Swiss-Prot record:
Biological role: Prevents the cell division inhibition by proteins MinC and MinD at internal division sites while permitting inhibition at polar sites. This ensures cell division at the proper site by restricting the formation of a division septum at the midpoint of the long axis of the cell.
A Gene Ontology biological process term: cell division
Cell division among keywords: yes
Keywords: Cell cycle, Cell division
Pfam families in UniProt: MinE (PF03776)
Protein name in UniProt: Cell division topological specificity factor
Length: 88
């Protein structure tokens, strides 16, 4: 009988239980945040990358992070000037 119990163990695996607990902890931490830390750095990097190709005013790049149900949506709006391409 011990062999059958070992082969057909019905107890939940500890790895699965740990995974579920970790997912709960991560979900709670995400809900508790007031705002993402990475947005200022992302904004600076986007300005640098876009400026390589187009002369753009840094104030014309807007970034926002919105929650829609279980999803987080990152919106990036760039106002591009007409005929102001930078030659690489």
């Amino acid at each position: 009988m011990a062999l059958l119990s070992f082969l057909f163990n019905t107890k939940p695996k500890t790895a699965n239980a740990a995974k579920e607990r970790l997912q709960i902890i991560i979900a709670r931490e995400r809900n508790g945040r007031t705002g993402p830390d990475f947005l200022p750095a992302l904004h600076k990097e986007l300005i640098a990358v876009i400026s390589k190709y187009v002369k753009v005013n840094p104030d014309d790049i807007k970034i926002s992070l919105n929650s829609q149900g279980n999803l987080e949506v990152l919106d990036v709006n760039v106002v591009l000037p007409e005929d102001e391409l930078v030659k690489p």
